[in-house]
Swiss-Prot record:
Keywords: Protein biosynthesis, Transferase
Enzyme class, broadest EC rank: transferase
Job of this protein: Attaches a formyl group to the free amino group of methionyl-tRNA(fMet). The formyl group appears to play a dual role in the initiator identity of N-formylmethionyl-tRNA by promoting its recognition by IF2 and preventing the misappropriation of this tRNA by the elongation apparatus.
Reactions performed catalytically: L-methionyl-tRNA(fMet) + (6R)-10-formyltetrahydrofolate = N-formyl-L-methionyl-tRNA(fMet) + (6S)-5,6,7,8-tetrahydrofolate + H(+)
A family per Pfam: Formyl_trans_C
Organism for this UniProt entry: Endomicrobium trichonymphae
Protein name as catalogued: Methionyl-tRNA formyltransferase
Gene name of this polypeptide: fmt
Gene3D superfamilies registered for this protein in UniProt: 3.40.50.12230
Amino acid sequence: MRILFFGTAFISETYLKELHKKCHEIFVVTTPDKPALRGQKLIYPAVKVYAVKNNISFIQPEKFTLDVIETIKNFAADTGVAVAYGKLIPKVVFDIPKYKTFNIHFSLLPKYKGAAPVQHALCRGETETGISSFYIEEGLDTGGIIIQEKLNISIKDNAETLLNKLILLGIDVMNKTLELFRCGKCDAASQTGDPSFAPSLKKIDGLVNWNKRAGEIYNQFRGLYLWPGIYSTISQGKLVGKRIKFREIEVFDSDSINKDSGIVYSAEKNRGFTVSCAVGRILVVKMQSENKPVVSAWDFIQGRQISAGDRF
């Protein structure tokens, strides 16, 4: 098939590789290069890097001008596939291919519409998620569902492990969707159920609210594992004012009622230290203070950098 592929990030690259492996004819639309944080060097989108290496035609439009639209039309695509493109695709573009354009979304729509469905599902303690292939419309993730497949979420899953599972499931859903189109089947079902939203993450999302239950804080850790991580500032103790990132935590107990929350409660030999929550306690296993390497929480408390009774 002739496929118009919209994608940018490393996730998108995995899907482009799959299409290339299947010997489809591909034309890539990706985002412009971005300047590095320091210096003048430009960072290429992962999809562009793969396209250049494999002699796949691509464009990087800032906007979908008339010339860009004409270039896309001239490719005469059978369908369009969008995976983590990162920009809105206008109707005049997504309607160009014979079978329109579909998106691979990492949730069971209409749940978790938006840019960060995996992270928000984990933060809210969901036990099930999945992949949706759906036709792109002008609304946010509102189009008709072509295929949905479910995936159970393990309590040990974090954003990295769950994302890896969903990437593989999404590739399977993409291939099944393309096979439907190849057979001339392009039906879709309207989305049903109450929608929920998964907006882009911000650094402040990682701030721990100790007045929550231990399980809720653990879910926050799981969801924000890749970025921005979870953190808190010491408000009472030797390191007052220092921000601590929690690199590995566990639920130590889930139902104790604590008079105060955010208190370093106990040292647990060779494991770390516990912190009280509104209900329950978390066990800090690995941590990182500002501008320092990641260390064992047990070693940190042994070094008397933090003590029972200190407060976050």
